[in-house]
C-alpha cells in the first residue's frame, strides 16, 4: 500500500449579494466570503461560506476546524497572505499537527497584476465556479445552500473531466 501525500491550496473569495426584492429588510444580504480548499489540480476538497464581516485569517480557522479528521493525508497547505498570523498558525497546529503551511505572498516591488505560483490554481477554480449560473452571483440566503451549489459545481467539473479526457 502506498502512502498518499496531498498538498492543498486555500484562498478566499468575496461575493456580493444579488439585488433581488426581499420580503423584509432583515433578509437583505450584504455579502459572503467563500473559503475553498483545493488540491494541486484545482478540484474542490472543502468549502466554507460565511458572512463577509469575518477576516480571512479567522475564516481560515473555521475551514481548518471543520477539516478535523477528514484529510489525514494532507501534509502541506499553500495559503495567500490573508491567512497570516499567530492565531491561524496555532489553530492549524492544534487541529492538524502534521500540516506544514506555506504563505504565497506578492513581492513588494511588483506593480500591477502578477501571476503568483500555486495561487493561480485557486483563482482558476473560482473562475470555473463563475461559469456556473448559480455561482456567478450570490443568490442564496443560506450559507449551507451556497456550499451545496459549490459542491454541485465541483461534481459537474469532475464528471466533465472524466467523460471528456481530451
Regions found by a protein language model. Name each.
Residues 2-9, 13, 17-18, 89, ...:
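Basic, amphipathic alpha-helical segments enriched in Lys/Arg and hydrophobic/aromatic residues
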Residues 29-102, 106, 150-153, 166:
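Polybasic low-complexity intrinsically disordered regions
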Residues 23-26:
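N-terminal polybasic/positive-inside topogenic patches
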Amino acid at each position: 500500500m502506498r502512502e498518499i501525500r496531498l498538498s492543498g491550496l486555500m484562498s478566499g473569495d468575496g461575493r456580493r449579494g444579488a439585488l433581488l426584492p426581499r420580503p423584509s429588510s432583515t433578509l437583505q444580504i450584504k455579502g459572503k466570503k467563500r473559503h475553498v480548499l483545493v488540491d494541486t489540480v484545482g478540484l474542490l476538497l472543502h468549502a466554507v461560506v460565511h458572512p463577509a464581516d469575518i477576516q480571512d485569517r479567522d475564516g481560515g480557522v473555521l475551514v481548518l476546524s471543520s477539516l478535523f479528521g477528514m484529510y489525514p493525508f494532507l501534509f502541506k497547505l499553500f495559503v495567500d497572505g490573508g491567512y497570516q498570523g499567530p492565531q491561524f498558525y496555532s489553530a492549524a497546529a492544534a487541529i492538524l499537527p502534521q500540516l506544514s503551511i506555506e504563505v504565497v505572498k506578492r513581492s513588494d516591488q511588483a506593480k500591477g497584476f502578477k501571476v503568483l505560483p500555486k495561487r493561480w490554481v485557486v483563482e482558476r477554480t473560482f473562475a470555473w465556479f463563475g461559469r456556473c449560473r448559480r455561482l456567478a452571483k450570490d443568490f442564496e440566503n443560506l450559507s449551507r445552500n451556497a456550499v451545496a451549489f459549490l459542491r454541485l459545481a465541483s461534481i459537474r467539473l469532475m464528471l466533465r473531466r472524466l467523460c471528456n479526457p481530451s
